[in-house]
Amino acid sequence: MTTPLLRLTGVSKSFLGTNALQDISLEVDAGKVLCLLGDNGAGKSTLIKIMSGFHKPTTGTIEINGEPVDFESPRDASDQGIATVHQFGGTFPLMGVGRCFFVGAEPTKGWGPFKLFDKKVAGDIAVREMQSLGITRVTDGDRLVGSLSGGERQALAIARAVYFGANVLILDEPTAALGVKEAAHVLRIIMQARAKGVAVILVTHNVRHAMMVGDHFAVLIRGQKADDFRKGERTREEITDLMAGGEAMADLEAELAQLQADA
């Protein structure tokens, strides 16, 4: 049996005595997409911060390739190959594409104290990596990031993460602020990252998008894992109902039906 690339076992997190996460266990394999589903307040953001090294779990363990790890900082998580791309890509609108791609790891030319940022190398690599993900409209590494569409900014951030060796790619609501065509392109990019052997964790409340790309699904409700299933084991309606609270949603539907009948 293949060892999961990333495994969480019994992870809980408390803040001042309040449980934000309770006993979360998850696995994600290389070349697979785990969709982490949940409504606002479900605990998704806290779980992202634990996996990316911003928070330490109160209890529980994290393993990379079967080996226990203890993240003291986001740098520790990054060194283990975990990259997180947030909703707006973490990009810089007033930078060129090449400069933004290499922030903190700039290629240089020259010698000793006379080293300078190698804009051409940076731009060429950034354009090449973006085009490998299907962003063919970007041909100039000097183009300002602010001129890119939302989907292109997401592609830039994803391409950067993969280029710098991400084995686990956490995407936090990557399609939330995008139109239909832009969202579709981001979903295609997710599948391309999957094909490269990257383990993708797609954090979303959009069930339709999750079902298009996901291999494995977990639903969080109020900090607990409410369900864990594979592709094809649940219908979209079942997942939506679970996320909405099941009985609570049924009660609301009955109440609205009664109001319509009384109108």
Whereabouts are the PLM-identified features?
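Glycine-rich phosphate-binding loops of nucleotide-dependent enzymes
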Residues: 2-263
